[in-house]
Amino acid sequence: MKRIAIQGERGSFHDITAHQYFEGEQIEIICCATFEEVFENIKRDPTVVGICAIENTIAGSLLHNYELLRQSGTTVVGEHKLHIEHSICCLPEDDWSTLQEVHSHPVALMQCGKFLANHPDLKAVEAEDTAGSAAYIAQHKVRGWAAICSSYAAHMYGMKVLQENIHDNPHNYTRFLVVCNPQKAALLRPIEKANKASIVFSLAHDKGSLSKVLTILSFYDINLTKIQSLPNIGHEWEYLFYVDLTFDNLTRYRQSIDAITPLVKKIKVLGEYEEKE
């Protein structure tokens, strides 16, 4: 049985992702309060696999998680893209007329801004987790409170779904990374199926340095699907570039990494894995 560390409670979007990614397999979920705790679990027990959100089509990149990934020593072995759908739920004995507050993660509240604007009588309260909000209300039987979470979480905690699909934008997707101890990577993904990689590198303050790297990647038929820059702490005005690459030929991709290595100050391959639509 695989042990999967996630940020959040049972019923959270990380939990849904874990069950979808490992569909048909027996898994044990380890609920963590923070993303730091996810990586700490992998460090303590090399058999643990982690699920980590990295970007959302509306909220953007989770910048802190890029740094956690780089510093953790783990490797990326997969990705999963989840359609985020928000519902509002409450205790079975409550209804619209009895509700006073709605609790959820700040990002979920932001993504349901129009719905909340249409219900000015509901006080929006920030919480640490979407599913955790539903769990708290259910376990403490708090009358007058509602939670914004997935309908999956609502049903898990015996809550009543008042309305589904309350998010502003239907094109709301989160991309999650599956990470593990590097020595366990071969057991979780066949390298011959890899057609995507995540790398990070820094560059010297030379004119055209980034352009030269991109030109070489293009020569090897490597496609950039994302590039994210973050300050390199301790090195003024120097940046780390987190890049996602896709390719058709694993050998050509690895040749491209060899070719750009002399042009960068530091380079690290964060993972090689199969791209998901």
What is the role of each PLM region?
Residues M1-E277:
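Domain-level signature for soluble enzymes in the chorismate/prephenate branch of the shikimate pathway
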